[in-house]
Amino acid sequence: MILKKCQFSEEREQIVAEAIRPVATELRLIDAADFIALLRFESYASIADLVESAAELYFLPGTVNFGLGGNYNLDWDSRPEVILDLELKPRGVTVYARLVLAGDTAGIEISHINFQQPSGDPDENTAFLAKSLAESKFVKTYPLPLAS
């Protein structure tokens, strides 16, 4: 199920992307061929271990988990791309997302967000998501200035 895009989707994806950036960086250190082999042979427990190991440096245990599967794109005329299903479970919210790892980039696409006690105000829900993710981190990160 794909999250119906709304005016809050992009902001929430950016919040999640910033939060899991260090995890994506750690996962990109693993060779794409290894991920592809693990996905092809459905070695999901091994992928879950890799995701857990990458996340344990930055988040409280159980916050970032491998989801139900993944996929890969591997064609002769392009660089490999690995897609991993992730479940993020900070306090009070569960985010189901796909992490896309490619050449020099990584991206996130949220499939669904479940707030345990949703507010009627979407802005409050977005602020709660950001706060909950920040509270679940071991290492507090600060925005880096963009190079000009």
From Swiss-Prot:
Alphabetized InterPro entries for the sequence: UCP034217
Family per similarity comment: To A.tumefaciens Atu0565/AGR_C_992.
Record's protein name: Uncharacterized protein R00649
Organism per entry: Rhizobium meliloti (strain 1021) (Ensifer meliloti)
Lineage: Bacteria, Pseudomonadati, Pseudomonadota, Alphaproteobacteria, Hyphomicrobiales
